[in-house]
């Protein structure tokens, strides 16, 4: 990899790490009631794993993504410099400024939605199966591996669909909490 491409990847990974830190890390994701509820609903709706979640993902999520990006852009464009300063002073229980937490929450909402649609496209792809079948030949073991892969991606995908829906509530809660913040006293 050339130097400029390597630098761009390092910057990209660094920004993702910063977002994840401000969001609360993987522990925050896996401990989230929204994620847990999404996982439970996915297990209860085994039929979705087959392929129904793909249709849901590709029909629901793009509209939600447009709404998310629009809300994110509008919210951050109307916040005044004074309010941004105040939001940097208000910290959550982990010591992360509320402005960074709010930003990370909206980014997480968008990131999960994009991931959901991406997984749906990968789930429906057949190129890898076709290439391996051509190289190795038809094999029941190969078919078993691909069946297991489709079940796993179906579970992941349906969980992401539910999680994307529930994250709309999380984003609304951030905006609601923003309205309840009291400006800190001058020092």
Spans of model-derived segments:
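Hydrophobic alpha-helical membrane-embedded segments
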Residues: 59-78
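Membrane-helix interface/capping segments
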Residues: 74-94
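Membrane-interfacial helical/loop segments at transmembrane boundaries in membrane proteins
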Residues: 127-146
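Alpha-helical transmembrane segments and their membrane-interface junctions
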Residues: 111-133
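N-terminal juxtamembrane cytosolic/stromal segments of multi-pass membrane proteins
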Residues: 1-40
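Loop-to-transmembrane boundary segments
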Residues: 23-33, 95-118
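Alpha-helical membrane-embedded segments
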Residues: 148-177
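Short membrane-interface loop/juxtamembrane segments of multi-pass integral membrane proteins
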Residues: 87-105, 141-146
């Amino acid at each position: 990899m050339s130097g400029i491409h390597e630098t761009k990847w390092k910057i990209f990974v660094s920004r993702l790490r910063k977002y994840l830190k401000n969001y609360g890390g993987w522990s925050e994701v896996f401990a989230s009631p929204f994620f847990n509820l999404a996982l439970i609903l996915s297990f209860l709706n085994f039929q979705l794993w087959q392929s129904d979640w793909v249709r849901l993902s590709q029909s629901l999520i793009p509209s939600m993504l447009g709404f998310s990006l629009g809300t994110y852009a509008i919210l951050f464009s109307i916040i005044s410099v004074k309010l941004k300063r105040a939001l940097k002073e208000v910290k959550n229980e982990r010591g992360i400024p509320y402005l960074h937490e709010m930003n990370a929450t909206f980014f997480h909402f968008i990131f999960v939605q994009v991931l959901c649609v991406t997984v749906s496209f990968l789930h429906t792809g057949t190129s890898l199966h076709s290439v391996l079948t051509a190289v190795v030949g038809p094999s029941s073991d190969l078919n078993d591996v691909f069946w297991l892969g489709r079940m796993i991606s179906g579970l992941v995908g349906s969980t992401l669909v539910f999680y994307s829906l529930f994250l709309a509530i999380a984003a609304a809660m951030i905006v609601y909490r923003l309205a309840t913040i009291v400006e800190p006293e001058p020092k």
